[in-house]
Amino acid sequence: MILVDTSVWIDHFHHSDPVLVSLLHEDEIGSHPLVAEELAMGSLRARDDVLRHLAHLRQFPVLSHDELLTLVAAHALWGRGLSPVDAHLLGSV
């Protein structure tokens, strides 16, 4: 199962990625609520369709606040330029 980051989806929406399309057809792509939320905040063509399709993909788990802070401490993730969303995605895979 592959978690696709927001930037990869945005690139795909601008120029279809045949590898991503193939992986989607093979049911190898999953999503995360924070990726859907980031995309929902942007300017998407066919916004409702995109969000609906993302919701139908298998979902990666969401970390609690304490789980995220434990992950950051355990792997010394501070000061590396990661956003909280990046850390959540790392912790969900």
Regions found by a protein language model. Give the residues of each.
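Active-site neighborhoods of divalent-metal-dependent phosphate/nucleic-acid chemistry enzymes
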Residues: 12, 18, 59-93
